[in-house]
């Protein structure tokens, strides 16, 4: 029996799934471009393929840099109860209170977003087209991760409540089933963020507050589905894999009041607004003369190394799921 259970677990997780999934990170950056003003669109839209493709680079980097993993999450419940007043919102204050090792152990995503915002603002100010596109693509990744409830709690894959696999279910399986056919990505336009720290921490607290619901609803619905109804076998990339069934996913997303769609829409808006804010803070430099030329030899080698290490499949530090 134990061997059979292990076999099914391997089938269920045979496709590596990352934060929001590669597919959804690409979609979030893609849709964020269309919320930008024309002065930014002139650079971002022609390079929408680059911004989408390289949205997943931070996940790939977890395979070559041990420190990368902590940039994707925050085990906020380690620091007490909602609204987690014990955590200083300022990074330097948090360092003095908890130490770098503690912060690294329990995640630094809200502070890392602010660091990446500083990098993007600098790139805009210097009119460095390669840095603008690279930093914008990667900033979008971290912002999107902060909108995932299971990235903001220690029970990040249901491992503490016998719900292993819920992480990939929420952020990959559900979006892949419904995003293209049912979800609405007409969101409006990007807005300037006057206080970045307040904005990011508000999103962090939203995710933290939703984590319990993500877990409890899955457990509740599971009581009404037999195992053969909850899961289904599908062909994927030439392999038979065990997935959550469409019927179960539909019931779950409905029970969550379409939370996954709402968090994705919020991610798109936040990514676009952060890009826009960085540009405004840099003095709104004209971007019409910037074109994204071919990658330099060193840039090409960096991306090739990322892809090579990712394909090896050995993440350093804590895995996302």
Per-range role (PLM):
Residues 1-4:
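Positively charged n-region of N-terminal signal peptides that target proteins for export
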Residues 14-16:
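N-terminal signal peptide c-region/cleavage motif recognized by signal peptidases
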Residues 18-134, 138, 149, 154-247, ...:
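N-terminal, motif-rich segments that launch catalysis or mediate targeting to/interaction with membranes
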Residues 140-144:
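Functional cores that coordinate and move charged inorganic groups
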